Amino acid sequence: MSVKKQLERLSELGAYYHKNGWMPGTAGNLSIRIPEESGFWVSGSGLDKDLLNKRNFLYVDLESGKPVDSKNVKATKGLKPSAETSIHRAVYRALDEVGCGLHVHTLESNLICANTSKNEPIALFELPAIEILKAYGIWEENPKVYVPIIYNFPNVQDISDCLEKYLKEYRPHVPFCIIEKHGITVWGKDAVQANRNLEATDFILKYMTSWKSFSYSGEPRKLSVSDVLEQDRREIFSVEFPVYPATFY
């Protein structure tokens, strides 16, 4: 598929996500990377996602993180990259196989809290072992699957640095991360897979946050990961990130 066609597809997804309430206002951004090129395309800053077109995407050099000219599509004059461009860049720099990144601000992703901080900016928590995990290619029975949640630094570059370091050192279980009180970044080999992963992620987060309202014991059901031992974490991740029970706003 040509670059123009891929950008048109991202524009369609932007309108769909805006309608779903995943990209309210001008929040969020979408990107693709072409394997044979040295950069990636990302939606510009301050744009209504229901009105995107192929000229609303900037071509960004992967190494420098700066916008550069492209022979494929000429971006709208004066278009600027979002600060969150660095999040997409972090994923592409860490994971060679990724060809699409979707950064959205869903309500459910903002309700999940792991009490991260500047001193402990990454926590891990366990996802529920439900059927939809198969969308990520996880087929084990009752798998132990963890997702990173990252502190919402005021400077987005600090978020990106944290994410890139994590992805490079510890192979993620699932193709997404949560930025606390901010949103989620989801990725895939192309826009089709990334969109599929985002739909699965949205379902999982809706399921998780529903536990606060529906309980079989009379108390809100929260993620029970406090029993994950330090040794278990070292075996799975070889890393000393804290594992917290998730709480909900």
Curated annotation (Swiss-Prot):
One of its GO terms (molecular function) is zinc ion binding. The keyword Amino-acid biosynthesis applies. InterPro entries: Aldolase_II/adducin_N (IPR001303), Aldolase_II/adducin_N_sf (IPR036409), MethylthioRu-1-P_deHdtase_MtnB (IPR017714). Keywords: Amino-acid biosynthesis, Lyase, Metal-binding, Methionine biosynthesis, Zinc. Pathway: Amino-acid biosynthesis; L-methionine biosynthesis via salvage pathway; L-methionine from S-methyl-5-thio-alpha-D-ribose 1-phosphate: step 2/6. Pfam families: Aldolase_II. GO terms for cellular component: cytoplasm. It comes from the Bacteria. It catalyses: 5-(methylsulfanyl)-D-ribulose 1-phosphate = 5-methylsulfanyl-2,3-dioxopentyl phosphate + H2O. GO terms for biological process: L-methionine salvage from methylthioadenosine. Its EC number is 4.2.1.109. Binds 1 zinc ion per subunit. Its cofactor is Zn(2+). Zn(2+) binds at residues 103, 105. It is an enzyme of class 4 (lyase). PANTHER family: METHYLTHIORIBULOSE-1-PHOSPHATE DEHYDRATASE (PTHR10640:SF7). Belongs to the aldolase class II family. MtnB subfamily. This is Methylthioribulose-1-phosphate dehydratase. It comes from Leptospira interrogans serogroup Icterohaemorrhagiae serovar copenhageni (strain Fiocruz L1-130). The gene is mtnB.
